[in-house]
Amino acid sequence: MTLTSFHPGQVWNDTNGNRIQAHGGSIITVDGVYYWYGENKEFTVPGSTIWHWGVRCYSSTDLYNWEDRGLIVPPVEDDPEHPLHPGQAVDRPHIIFNEQTGKFVCWIKVMSKGSLQRSTVLVADDILGPYEIVQTWLRPLSMSAGDFDLVVDPHDGKGYYVFERVHSELIVADLTDDYTNVTGYYSTHFPQPQPPFVREAPAHFYRDRKHYLLTSGTTGYYPNPSESAVSPTIHGPYTVLGDLHPTDASRTSFHTQISSVFEHPLKKDLYIALGDRWLPTYLDDGDRAHRAFEEHFAPGRDGDVRMEEFAEVNTSRADYVWLPLRFEGDRPVIDWHDEWSLDDFEDR
């Protein structure tokens, strides 16, 4: 069935009729074709030791109908210590194109047992690969680096790595000219004492000469209120603008965590928030999970708070919620739509 509109939160199949597996995903445009890539979670079910099955990519010319282009970063099955082994917690791949080197550069977060999180960096001549690993177990700035976004300045091509310093604050770091490492220069933002208050899952976009960051709180796969902030420069200072979903009474960002923001190249002022509904059957409000995580990470606690309810999830069945941003002055806002279309927006 050919789609002609978006249906947020509904099961989204590819052109072969299979459930799309591109979680924690982003879109990159290459030669007029859209490529949506993300974590392949098809085998990540409760009781499984499989966290991921590589990075899968899809292509489209209309953003509605997606052709499966396969695994652009396959799992490494025969080495449990390899960062791409299916048992490693591979999350949130991001790919940017380097005009100077002609390479596509992919960063992937890998979370080890405990709280240490590091990065693997790969490069390719084509968006579909093959990708060659150039960095493994990288600790940018000697920090434990969690959820992140990669940013290319639209004016000078300079690259930035925006990441959560785990359970602490948000970092904006300059990338090297080839985008495969950090230079050492960075700025810090939104310091918080502990989850669930720490901001994670940063999604950057640029509009009207301003830099925006959308972030979530830290409650695992359980959704919580998203927050927006704006700055005249990528290194800040950022002004917090408040809840991104002010009409959502559940305080769960419409049961979604945003992974990236896509600026449509052919539509005027259309920015699409790409989100994962990690837990389609979890319809509770966000306060219960928020309280559980706050207590679990409280100073002096040693992890003895019961968290089983918030640990056993089936991300193989996660859905997607794509919604357009609208702006009240400088403030981005997301409203719920059961269905929406690109035809609702003016052409450039």
Question: Predicted segments — roles?
Answer:
Residues M1-R348:
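Carbohydrate-active catalytic/glycan-binding domains of CAZyme proteins
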